[in-house]
Amino acid sequence: EMTSSLVGSEMCIRDRIRPIEHGADIVIHSATKFIGGHGSSLGGVIVDGGKFDWKKDAEKFHTLAKPDLSYHGAVFADVAGQAAFVTRIRAVILRDTGAAISPFNAFILLQGLETLSLRVERHVENALKVVDYLKNNPKVSKVNHPSLPDHPDHALYEKYFPKGAGSIFTFEIKGGKEEAWKFIDSLEIFSLLANVADVKSLVIHPYTTTHSQMTPDELAQQHITPSTIRLSIGTEHIDDILSLIHISEPTRLDVIS
């Protein structure tokens, strides 16, 4: 059976990994994240690798390999060739839904592209330093980042991310939900937002916000507990980031009991 592979690459960008070079057929990016970089616009990108033969299983991929009556019987796999998938998205999906990025958002995202590689270097550099601090902090029970040898995906990280992965990760603080929120509320330059991959450092408590509608079993499957804190490390100076995490106040990690 023919199967196409689609990769959602919202948390990583082409500067770190190129999924099509590893066999992906379709790659989806959230331009709102690293591409724009400032959480100021909404947009997305769909990249068609152009290597998948949609006609080899015409029944399964009938929208691409069989005639489209709304276009006088045109077969997208014949008319557009390697670009059949993205061509149908523009010709049919956009036609039917009317989705279109605003010119101003497009302008902002294009500006973001100009500094993408530079920003990502700083994101990754900062994130690895925060991970290194947290993993050695006695008030932290676990850090979930693939760069760490005990992470279940560490081997994949070493294989596919020789330049380092993204800057979004979680950790478990000792003391449960109460201590998690004490820590979150104490952070000053971190913004409490559900967005990620912003130049601003972001923090959130998934258990009571983004994933609060999940059942206990679903939360367990996602390894989300009352102690889980998600960080999206920004491009601020690393000394400023670490100083916020490590200030001698009862609400900060160095003295949480």
What is each residue range found by the language model?
Residues 47, 170-172, 232-234:
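Short hydrophobic/aromatic beta-strand micro-patches
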Residues 55-59, 182, 243:
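Short, charged, solvent-exposed linker or helix-capping segments at domain edges/interfaces
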Residues 119, 176, 185-186, 201-248, ...:
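PLP-dependent enzyme catalytic core of the Aspartate aminotransferase-like
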Residues 17, 132, 181, 239, ...:
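Alpha-helical elements of the RecA-like P-loop NTPase motor core of helicases
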Residues 4-5, 9-10, 14-137, 144:
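Conserved PLP-enzyme active-site core in the AAT-like
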Residues 1-13, 246, 250-257:
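Single conserved hydrophobic/aromatic residue that forms the stacking wall/gate
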Residues 97-100, 105-106, 115, 121-122, ...:
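Conserved small-domain helix->loop->beta segment predominantly found in fold-type I
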Residues 39, 163-165, 224-227:
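Short glycine-enriched loop/turn motifs at secondary-structure junctions
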